[in-house]
Swiss-Prot record:
Catalyzes the last two steps in the biosynthesis of 5-methylaminomethyl-2-thiouridine (mnm(5)s(2)U) at the wobble position (U34) in tRNA. Catalyzes the FAD-dependent demodification of cmnm(5)s(2)U34 to nm(5)s(2)U34, followed by the transfer of a methyl group from S-adenosyl-L-methionine to nm(5)s(2)U34, to form mnm(5)s(2)U34. This is tRNA 5-methylaminomethyl-2-thiouridine biosynthesis bifunctional protein MnmC. Residues 1-244 are annotated as: tRNA (mnm(5)s(2)U34)-methyltransferase. Its EC number is 2.1.1.61, 1.5.-.-. One of its GO terms (biological process) is tRNA wobble base modification. InterPro entries: FAD-dep_OxRdtase, FAD/NAD-bd_sf, MnmC-like_methylTransf, SAM-dependent_MTases_sf, tRNA_MAMT_biosynth_bifunc_MnmC, tRNA_MNMC2, tRNA_S-uridine_synth_MnmC_C. HAMAP family: MnmC.
Length: 623
């Protein structure tokens, strides 16, 4: 996607027809759904027009069906196909995914008002609204795992969004929706239609309420067959189309390269990266063996507390900014876990004060607030920015919940060799094969280099957290402070400080000098409060070594083309922030599902970016 300005929400007028509030776009001068009955029109045009009742009911085990939509609007089409999915889906781990684009998203309050028109959809609408993202550019993945349903809501101009989408799975059915071509001609231009076709394949179907010439000509130019059955209500026609197979095979075949049976995956490394990969695979119905030579969370992932504290970028960079995208996904992901608690983080403006505080004016309201130093509950000379949607995770509680998943098994042993042979991956310990899987994901940070000679070099960064008894808390338990380090309550009468930062050090013993370092950090910004803390000799601590890539982007993807070996590593000090989205990216890649980030960002994460070919350390055998 190209650099764009911040997302503007839709400006609406409302018309009341038969007691139903119908939203009307002031920008485009058109209604969002039919005044006759928008839900019935959606079913007639988009669901029946794509033969979705039969196609969804006939999905094979583990099959992945993808719907594309050109205008999210009120989300009515999404809820209608979701409702249909509930009614006809087979009990076989098949999955329905929707990709939708919206340039002017409704505000959350307007969305709630618009969807009140459909009482039969209210339960689904509430679930959608609960996860409805902030109006920030980029891809927002909304997962509903119990429903085997997911949505990628791309906020931005269709001209920018569609070219940036990675074609890892072709769209099976298109909802060509949006305002009428006469009201919004840009959405129906040739450039957009070309991208829609790029994301499609033989057997893809298309449906639209519009039979405008620009749409028909654009589809026909690509060899897509068009018919014009009767439209909804008073409309004489609608558009129904299909991209026929070259040899005229059955056009009801759904394209895709998903596994047709349950797969078995080995995940090497039981830190935060490995736990997230295991969870993402198990949630899709696949069996996972999580392997580590030590107990889970023995490395850098095992601190007593993890703070989600992203440094947000200028709003114009959000669409492709990894940290912003990860933060938005993580806060939705962790809300499904008892280990998570939503908090506020007060980020002190230590440098470039004006530029940091100006972020509050760029982001949607309720995300950020700027405050003067005088407003701080802790005496300081620094102004600060309050991030309202930060969070705290208890790593051990999170780990326990992941390992309770019935499809995840943990085994403790050291891996000495990996053999990729006959389409499977075998893990060996002391020259004995102890585990065979369909594929393996390497998540063992710097230890990965012991298995792969040309595995990208990850630099060590030592970090130590400190905690101690403290009975004076002039700030609320749902608040944290960030100032190069951080401080917050660990327990009702304990304060935790983090963390020292020592690049190129791999020692992990608790050191008094690092306690002093953490004290000096908090003393530099809150000198009066720091004087109330107990002596550093009474502090407790935990030291560990993080792994960071040379360019600070994680390693996410396939280690070598056509290999069954993948990796997620190099998360640095942002493991709990980065892991949810990056594991989702990786698992989607492995299973051939839609990618939740742009092609540009995906390339930045590719572990092969540092080398032309991964050379595996002997003894490693491939055939």
């Amino acid at each position: 996607m190209c650099v764009s300005s911040s997302i503007q929400t839709a400006i609406l007028d409302w018309q009341c027809v038969d007691g139903i509030d119908i939203p009307v776009s002031r920008q485009f001068g058109d209604v969002y759904f039919s005044k006759d009955n928008g839900l019935l029109e959606t079913r007639h045009v988009f669901l029946n027009g794509n033969n979705l009742t039969e196609r969804l009911a006939d999905l094979k085990p583990y099959q992945y069906f993808c719907v594309g939509e050109t205008g999210f609007g009120t989300g009515l089409n999404i809820l209608a196909v979701w409702q249909l999915w509930q009614q006809v889906r087979p009990d076989n781990h098949s999955h329905l995914h929707v990709i939708s684009v919206e340039k002017f998203p409704l505000s959350k309050s307007d969305l709630e008002r618009a969807l009140r028109a459909w009482p039969e959809l209210i339960i689904l609408a509430e679930q959608l609204i609960e996860q409805y993202p902030f109006p920030i550019a980029g891809c927002h993945r909304l997962n509903f795992p119990d429903e085997r349903f997911s949505l990628d809501l791309w906020l931005g101009d269709a001209h920018d969004v569609f070219p940036s989408i990675v074609k890892t799975h072709s769209v099976d059915a298109w909802f060509l929706d949006g305002f009428a071509p006469s009201c919004n001609p840009e959405l129906w231009e040739t450039q957009v239609l070309n991208q829609i076709v790029r994301l499609s394949d033989y057997g893809t179907t298309f449906a639209s309420f519009s039979v405008a010439g620009i749409l028909k000509r654009g589809l026909k130019a690509h060899g897509i067959h068009i018919s014009r059955p009767r439209g909804f209500g008073h409309k004489r026609e609608m558009l129904k189309a299909i991209w026929p197979f070259p040899d005229h095979e059955s056009t009801t075949t759904v394209k895709g390269n998903q596994p047709s049976t349950q797969q078995h995956f080995a995940v090497i490394g039981a830190g935060i990266a490995g736990l997230h990969c295991a969870w993402s695979l198990a949630q899709r119905g696949h069996r996972v063996t999580l392997v580590d030579q030590s107990q889970p969370l023995s490395g850098a992932s095992g601190n007593p507390l993890a703070l989600l504290n992203p440094k947000l970028c200028p709003i114009t960079q959000c669409h492709d900014h990894l940290m912003v995208l990860c933060w938005q996904y993580a806060r939705r992901f962790y809300q499904n876990f008892e280990a998570f608690r939503l908090i506020q983080v007060n980020q002190l403006a230590l440098k470039a004060s004006d530029s940091l505080l100006n972020l509050a004016e760029q982001y949607p309201k309720d995300v950020l607030d700027a405050h003067s130093a005088q407003q701080s509950p802790l005496e300081t000379q620094y102004d600060y920015l309050t991030l309202h949607y930060a969070g705290v995770i208890s790593p051990q509680l999170f780990c326990n919940q992941v390992l309770q998943h019935p499809l995840i098994e943990f085994k403790q042993f050291k891996i000495n060799q990996i053999i990729e042979i006959d389409g499977t991956v075998q893990l060996l310990s002391s020259e004995q094969a102890i585990l065979e899987s369909n594929a393996a994901i390497v998540c063992c940070a710097r230890e990965s280099g012991k298995l792969f000679e040309q595995y990208p070099t990850l630099k060590p960064i030592r970090g130590q957290v400190s905690w101690f008894e403290q009975h004076t808390f002039p700030f609320a338990p749902d608040q944290a402070f960030s100032y190069g380090g951080y401080c917050m309550q660990l327990h009702p009468q304990q304060l935790i400080l983090g963390a020292s930062f020592h690049p190129q050090r791999d020692d992990d013993e608790v050191l008094l000098e690092d306690h002093v370092h953490n004290f000096n950090l908090i003393h530099s910004v809150f000198p009066a409060y720091a004087q109330t803390l107990p002596p550093v000799e009474e502090w407790h601590g935990r030291a560990s070594v993080r792994a960071q890539s040379p360019d600070y982007f994680p390693l996410v993807g396939q280690l070598q083309d056509h290999s069954k070996l993948f990796t997620l590593a190099g998360l640095g000090s942002k493991g709990y922030l980065f892991a949810p989205l990056n594991s989702e990216i990786l698992v989607a890649h492995i299973l051939g599902e839609a990618c939740p980030v742009s092609a540009n960002l995906l390339q930045k994460l590719n572990p092969q970016r540092f080398l032309k070919k991964v050379k595996i350390k002997k003894p490693y055998y491939s055939s």
